[in-house]
């Protein structure tokens, strides 16, 4: 388990309680995952916090139930922009930000239509193949920024496929919460001409 301060743990507990309440009304996580909320979702998202320097801006793509965006805002204290097209999920994200005292801005638009200020870091979890994530991330990322994408067992295959379309610096960091999963860190990426 990732070590966090008592205050941060309390804020994460508030988030978990709120998510359980809202999940009864709107589908934020699958009902079978509620029992595994901490290891499956919160801990999985928390492992990114150690890779994020203090004070860096973050944009989370397809924020849904707040993973990893809200968790990172709580754990790091960094400002996080959450992009989510589902209005009901946006209402949840705003309430979670308020209840958990997290520095979040919620943009209720499709990723392609959103135009937040460029971020230092782009994150996403369980959203789309790497190729698509890079396409969405490129215009939203600062020149010297990087991306952190939580991926499952197909991480290496997605990286191989994306390498045909993108020049990039990358590394694969084994997931601490999913034996077959990985974090793909990407920087300096541009389309192959």
Swiss-Prot record:
Single GO molecular function: rRNA (guanine-N7-)-methyltransferase activity
GO CC term (a single one): cytosol
Catalysed reactions listed for this entry: guanosine(527) in 16S rRNA + S-adenosyl-L-methionine = N(7)-methylguanosine(527) in 16S rRNA + S-adenosyl-L-homocysteine
Binding sites annotated in the UniProt record for S-adenosyl-L-methionine: 62, 67, 111-112, 125
Pfam families: GidB
SUPFAM superfamilies with a match to the protein in the record: S-adenosyl-L-methionine-dependent methyltransferases
Entry keyword Hydrolase: no
InterPro entries referenced in this protein's UniProt entry, alphabetically: rRNA_ssu_MeTfrase_G (IPR003682), SAM-dependent_MTases_sf (IPR029063)
Keyword annotations from UniProtKB, A to Z: Cytoplasm, Methyltransferase, rRNA processing, S-adenosyl-L-methionine, Transferase
Annotated function: Specifically methylates the N7 position of guanine in position 527 of 16S rRNA.
The protein, known as: Ribosomal RNA small subunit methyltransferase G
Taxonomic lineage: Bacteria, Pseudomonadati, Pseudomonadota, Alphaproteobacteria, Acetobacterales
